[in-house]
């Protein structure tokens, strides 16, 4: 190899190494993103719902806190048409998510406090079924945020489905680098989380949750959002066309013992 070729090759290799090191440095500087499990406990109104709430409050949530899940959110439908409970569990890592159930089973205090429910007979189950989805938090909202603990607070849970992985990825980009999350923040629409659904129903999709002081604040914030020039520009950007094929919107209220 001639000296000139050698120097050229060496410079390219060095540049590649620097780029790689730069990427590693950026990754190291970026905040660790949480893994978010969103559960729906299917229950009947009345005694079954009450028993599940007691179990969550007195046994499951304290045990989850001991297992490293620092904050657990528990919610029910504002319109009360369904008795189901929605539970949000943020994990520090995918390994923490995988280990959570084993840690609970090994927790003697959990076994003691929840014995009646954990050992419930088939004729009187604690719940009908659990539906669960696993999400990875967005770059623009890497961790669950708890900024509002007012008794009147209202949560809004929204899921955006896409007809392809490529369009789903583009919608996530619209939130992150496109500025939609930043727009929410500017307009006082406080995020709880934004997550890309990795496993669950109706994928590909993303799901996010916002919190408002009350229903009046919810309506006023969305009115501001729809009229904002930045949103008008963003929604008409052709690169984000046809990124959403279906939207699910649910208004929730927190349980008295919810940590979110």
Model-derived features: where do they sit?
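Anionic, Ser/Thr-rich low-complexity intrinsically disordered regions
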Residues: 8-9, 29-32, 50, 160
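Short, glycine- and small/hydrophobic-rich beta-strand elements in well-ordered beta-sheets
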Residues: 21-32, 61-86, 92, 179-207, ...
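A short, compositionally biased domain-edge/stem linker segment
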Residues: 19-28, 139-145
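N-terminal secretory signal peptides and thylakoid transit peptides that target proteins
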Residues: 1-14
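Hydrophobic, ordered structural segments
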Residues: 41-52, 58-66, 70-147, 162-164, ...
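Short, cationic motifs built from Arg/Lys/His that form the positively charged side of catalytic pockets
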Residues: 3-4, 39, 158
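C-terminal functional regions that serve as terminal interaction/effector modules
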Residues: 31-34, 180, 184, 200-260
